[in-house]
């Protein structure tokens, strides 16, 4: 696992530990890597205590080689920004089997003139960059401009990211971070096998869901001590996989959420733990869109200066009092039957009906899932599916 992927995984669970407190019994979906990238772009211009807090919360202090370049135009953290640039260009390169759009942008009020050195370094490493807008006298126009940029960047899937009250004349800087994902499975689910089935949120409460079904060989970990199974579903390119962490019992998710962390996940999904098995898999069709204001989460993790008058962002603008007013994360992901290889047509229906001897992986109650970039083990998405 490379150093950025480790940093990303640690940050992923820090965020999850905060999110699960604020989103009890709800679906959760976020992209730790894109949040980290957007914050790295801010970190480029952070100085003093603000920089120290960010370095700690983002786990940049654990990256080997970080801080080794001191003569660079873009500061001592150039090594870290280069790692992000390499990983992001690898993951988002044009690919016929999945669509992944990560969009990060800093919107700064025009009264804080952005330093040309910062602009040039932000452009060097990050695609989104910085845009100056007029929050003070045209806040509503700025909000609409940001929303239309987000909609365009996410293929029209994320609309109205910023609600009408979120921007006002006191806003100084907003960081926007959105991600859209649609993947194609290595092996397709047959649409004819998809059925409406109950999805149990609790022992007493259930909702109908369109449940996809397939018989095939998958990597599976059976973990009796954790009362859980983990299934790996590969996407077509082989570069990405979805891993589903399914508790044995309907009410078993809380137990997993209490114990999960970076080291545990690495242990549970290691090659020693997972083995190829013929399985009968049931997985809900999912379309998840989530929007989060990350300000309170990041402050709870220890990044307090950035969102207050104590912020030192003199690497972005020499004008005093520049701070982040809002940090907004929008994410859209769709999971359906599409794949590159058919599972067989009429034969597969027969298989589904007459496969009682196969071990089942039936995701018909709350579970955790994540999408992994296999070459580096980076976690792209992390989520909880609680309810259809």
UniProtKB/Swiss-Prot annotation:
Residues glycosylated per entry: 95, 215, 293, 312
Alphabetized GO MF terms: serine-type endopeptidase inhibitor activity
GO cellular component: extracellular region; extracellular space
Tissue-wise expression: Major protein of egg white. Expressed in the magnum of the oviduct (at protein level).
PTM characteristics: N-glycosylated on at least two Asn residues by ovomucoid type carbohydrate units.
Disulfide bonds: 74-121
Site entry: Reactive bond homolog: 353-354
Subcellular location: Secreted
Domain of life: Eukaryota
Protein name in the entry: Ovalbumin-related protein Y
Gene name linked to the record: SERPINB14B
């Amino acid at each position: 696992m490379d150093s950025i992927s480790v940093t990303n995984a640690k940050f992923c669970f820090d965020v999850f530990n905060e999110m699960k407190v604020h989103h009890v019994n709800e679906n959760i979906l976020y992209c730790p890597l894109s949040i980290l990238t957007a914050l790295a772009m801010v970190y480029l211009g952070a100085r003093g205590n603000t920089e120290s807090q960010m370095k700690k919360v983002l786990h940049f202090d654990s990256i080997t080689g970080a801080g080794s370049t001191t003569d660079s135009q873009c500061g001592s953290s150039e090594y870290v920004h280069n790692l992000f640039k390499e990983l992001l260009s690898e993951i988002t390169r044009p690919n016929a089997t999945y669509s992944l759009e990560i969009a990060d942008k800093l919107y700064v009020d025009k009264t804080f003139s952005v330093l040309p050195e910062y602009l040039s370094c932000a452009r060097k490493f990050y695609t989104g960059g910085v845009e100056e807008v007029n929050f003070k006298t045209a806040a509503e126009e700025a909000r609409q401009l940001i929303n239309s940029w987000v909609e365009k960047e996410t293929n029209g899937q994320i609309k109205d990211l910023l609600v009408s009250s979120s921007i006002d004349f006191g806003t100084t800087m907003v960081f926007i971070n959105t991600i859209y994902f649609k993947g194609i499975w290595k092996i397709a689910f047959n649409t004819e096998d998809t059925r409406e089935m109950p999805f149990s949120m609790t022992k007493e409460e259930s909702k109908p869901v369109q449940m996809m079904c397939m018989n095939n060989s998958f990597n599976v970990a059976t973990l009796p001590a954790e009362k859980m199974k983990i299934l790996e579903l590969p996407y077509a390119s082989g570069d990405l996989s979805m891993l589903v962490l399914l508790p044995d019992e309907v009410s078993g998710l809380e137990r997993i959420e209490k114990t999960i962390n970076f080291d545990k996940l690495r242990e549970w999904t290691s090659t020693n733990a997972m083995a190829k098995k013929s399985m009968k898999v049931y997985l809900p069709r999912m379309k998840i869109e989530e929007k989060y204001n990350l300000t309170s989460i990041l402050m709870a993790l220890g990044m307090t200066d950035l969102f207050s008058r104590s912020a030192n962002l003199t690497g972005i603008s020499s004008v005093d009092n520049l701070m982040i007013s809002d940090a907004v994360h929008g994410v859209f992901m769709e999971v359906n039957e599409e794949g590159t290889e058919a599972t067989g047509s009429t034969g597969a229906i027969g298989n589904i009906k007459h496969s009682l001897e196969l071990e089942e992986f039936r995701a018909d109650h709350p579970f955790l899932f994540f999408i992994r970039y296999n070459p580096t083990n980076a976690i792209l998405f992390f989520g909880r599916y609680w309810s259809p």
